[in-house]
Amino acid sequence: MGAATYIGSTTRYQTVAVCPLYSFRLETGSTTKVSVYHVSEEPDIEVFEPRKINGAGEALVWAIDDARLRNYLVPRECPRVTFYAGPRTSVVDRERFLGSSVAVVAIEAAWFARLQSCRLFCYHLPAHHFTTYDETAGYLVSRTAVKPTSVDCISDPVAAILQRGVELRILPNLWSLRDAVVESTLEFSIIRWRNASPR
């Protein structure tokens, strides 16, 4: 999978404004409590209006649950491969891809400087507006406009990722990792792949 730089718990990054773990009840017929967020580089969003993706499909407001918030603590357009072990993940794949890590967010080295310098805004959203769209990816959707209840500024996204117990993996190119993960038994999300460097 190529050379990699691993940024672990001994990182020099210390300060960060991290989203508090507020819990809301998600009305999907279960009693599961989740936190609902939308991460943006825009600091002043007053209301999230339903929008169509690329002008097609149903207009929706998209949000992310707390467990997969880690996948969005990077610049919006940053290509990344994210993965973790699920119920069907084999012991071999767990050891090969994760080692002792709970989850991995992998980005290209070319994006690391932008990750270090970006400022993100984590909007807390009222969960009663949302239903689950994709449990593996942590996607939630609302068909009506949603006003955030609060917003946190994440001034150091690298520290925010690490504080969630996630391994941040920096690679020269993501293609080999992406291909291997897709063929594995891991749970994964591949995000903003159109922006990935060529093979």
Residue positions per predicted region:
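Compact, glycine/acidic-enriched structural inserts
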Residues: 67, 71-74
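Short, surface-exposed beta-edge/turn micro-motifs
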Residues: 32-35, 57-61, 67, 109, ...
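Conserved NAD+-utilizing ADP-ribose enzyme module
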Residues: 19, 24-27, 74-199
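N-terminal cationic amphipathic segment used for targeting or macromolecule association
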Residues: 1-3, 15
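Short, flexible beta-strand-to-coil junctions
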Residues: 38-44, 65, 125-130
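Surface-exposed flexible segments
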Residues: 44-61, 133-149
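ADP-ribose/NAD+-binding catalytic cleft of ART/PARP-like enzymes
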Residues: 12-58, 75-76
